[in-house]
Amino acid sequence: MSTTADIKAPAPPQPQQQQKMPGATSHMNPSPDHGETSYKGSGRLQGCAAIITGGDSGIGRAVAIAYAREGADVLISYFDEHDDAQETARWVTEAGRKAILVSGDIKQEAHCQELVERALEAFGRLDILVNNAAHQASFAKLEDISAEEWDVTFRTNVHSMFYLCKAAVPRMEPGSAIINTSSINAKSPSPTLLAYATTKGAIANFTAGLAQFIADRGIRVNAVAPGPIWTPLIPSTMPPEAVEGFGGNTPLGRAGQPAELAGVYVMLASNDSSYMTGALVPVTGGRPML
């Protein structure tokens, strides 16, 4: 685990900056903290195997590093951010675990099925599925949101989750865990992120429903609801002036770092949460989710 003192978590203002979607970690200022130097494992996932979508950067990278240091092998699913993915894989292998990189489009059911098969081929088992990849875009007016944009957001954020769970669940043993990344937007939607926020509400509902649907198989399903977290999504989807003050409206007065969520994903994947399923766990810097 990391301590707060170990994590680099600067308060705003951040420098105004903007990137093309989906963004690159190496171009962010300040650099995000994924727990590279702070996360210390304790063997809580020893011998496990995980799939992490969006594992190339941001929260996904922090989770991959933490899982590896807790003893898990990791398949890192990503779209086309090859440099970021290679860097995440480097941290996993430095922890002494296997890292498998698979690029492709999770909007396609066949690719989601391939991810599960690749994990089973590489690791011989699948214990943890982290549905973390997301598409986000900000719009000033409702009329600016195209039907294509709405469809892409739902196919990336929601449809892929269904495809992956459907492919993975029959191959997972009792005691396995599924962890979905929702958002504070599930309960407190940002109007300029209408499509994204709507999908995050759907993910919270999907999590609660699926948890009940497959409880008799001994597989737990939970979700994490991050608040403002400093990831490549921010400078690549928000205007520069919004980036500058990002996270300043939380009671803690700053954005969270990806490393500050990793421990929650570890807890939900491990036996520490053996009586938790269907939960939505907020990590929001003090912003309430009631």
Positions of the model-derived regions?
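Short, flexible catalytic-loop segment of classical short-chain dehydrogenase/reductase
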Residues: 204, 225-236
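Conserved mid-core segment of classical short-chain dehydrogenase/reductases
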Residues: 13, 108, 113, 121, ...
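Active-site helix of classical SDR
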Residues: 165, 199, 207
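Catalytic Tyr-X3-Lys loop
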Residues: 143-162, 179, 203, 252
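Short C-terminal tail/terminal secondary-structure segment
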Residues: 6-15, 28, 36-37, 139, ...
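The beta1-alpha1 cofactor-binding region of Rossmann-like NAD(H)/NADP(H)-dependent oxidoreductases
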Residues: 82, 103-116, 147, 259-260
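Short, small/polar-rich loop/turn modules that mediate ligand/substrate recognition or access, typified
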Residues: 215, 220, 276-278
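Residue(s) in the substrate-gating loop at a strand-loop-helix junction
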Residues: 183
